[in-house]
Amino acid sequence: MSQERPTFYRQELNKTIWEVPERYQNLSPVGSGAYGSVCAAFDTKTGHRVAVKKLSRPFQSIIHAKRTYRELRLLKHMKHENVIGLLDVFTPARSLEEFNDVYLVTHLMGADLNNIVKCQKLTDDHVQFLIYQILRGLKYIHSADIIHRDLKPSNLAVNEDCELKILDFGLARHTDDEMTGYVATRWYRAPEIMLNWMHYNQTVDIWSVGCIMAELLTGRTLFPGTDHIDQLKLILRLVGTPGAELLKKISSESARNYIQSLAQMPKMNFANVFIGANPLAVDLLEKMLVLDSDKRITAAQALAHAYFAQYHDPDDEPVADPYDQSFESRDLLIDEWKSLTYDEVISFVPPPLDQEEMES
């Protein structure tokens, strides 16, 4: 929000009052979730369509207030072609005392990867380009020591030129309830995060990319488990049961005991599972879908894989500036998180207008 306060106007949309700068016109609701509602709008300053998200009850509780601060800090930090970034942030409040609402403005993305998969069978070249961009974005995110945690087709926005942006970081940890049953929230989750095996690392995101890539190649969900146990069985049927070395790393005794009770299964030959796929694609999948997260390929390593030979450019796969996450371990009151958030809103500097805009 720039220092000179713009003129705001109010309107009601879906029983919610929106109070936005005159710069944003023609608001129309496009969706809502637990953490806010989103409208498409026309940005009269740039001539582009944008998404405006109004956070719902951003300071209702300490958890809400910290999540609000986290989301704003993350979005402000992200400056990469393959990652959603912040175009604007504003509040109608004139002072910290009045501050209760936060609005975030990002690119309006036309379709997500779900729409793309459903509509057409993708060529191998399409798959290369899409997965390359996901990994390019992940290399950047991971270099800032951030883990997405929730990569799935609906969190990957794609325009008609096949240009991709990663959306919706796993800001809020999913509740058990959201992970229960036949749900996409879980189908792309690494086993160690789904089953709380151990402290996880950035390669949980690589497992998700493997699941997404397999789906792009076959047109089918790779592990559509009906519940946690069914999902684990589907995973182990493909990658084989864990050996002694991995079992030792699983800190949860109940998880260890359960796995040891299962019949031993060998890893399947991926070439027989992904029949007709480019052998280099199969080789990359074998390196992503590894049960032991310490042995999974990283995003930076995957970008250098031969499968991406026509896209890989080590001089154009940037890393992020360091990201200070020390706030994560802080226990503050609602008003303290609110004050920190207000400072972030006030200090926001918009990206340069001539930046290559991604049209949907």
UniProtKB/Swiss-Prot annotation:
Modified residues (N-acetylserine): 2
Highest taxon, organism lineage: Eukaryota
Domain Protein kinase: 24-308
GO biological process: angiogenesis; apoptotic process; bone development; cartilage condensation; cell morphogenesis; cell surface receptor protein serine/threonine kinase signaling pathway; cellular response to ionizing radiation; cellular response to lipopolysaccharide
Residues found modified as Phosphothreonine: 16, 180
Gene3D superfamilies from the UniProt entry: Phosphorylase Kinase, domain 1, Transferase(Phosphotransferase) domain 1
Family: Belongs to the protein kinase superfamily. CMGC Ser/Thr protein kinase family. MAP kinase subfamily.
Assembly description: Component of a signaling complex containing at least AKAP13, PKN1, MAPK14, ZAK and MAP2K3. Within this complex, AKAP13 interacts directly with PKN1, which in turn recruits MAPK14, MAP2K3 and ZAK. Binds to a kinase interaction motif within the protein tyrosine phosphatase, PTPRR. This interaction retains MAPK14 in the cytoplasm and prevents nuclear accumulation. Interacts with SPAG9 and GADD45A. Interacts with CDC25B, CDC25C, DUSP1, DUSP10, DUSP16, NP60, SUPT20H and TAB1. Interacts with casein kinase II subunits CSNK2A1 and CSNK2B. Interacts with PPM1D.
Protein name (database record): Mitogen-activated protein kinase 14
Organism the protein comes from: Mus musculus (Mouse)
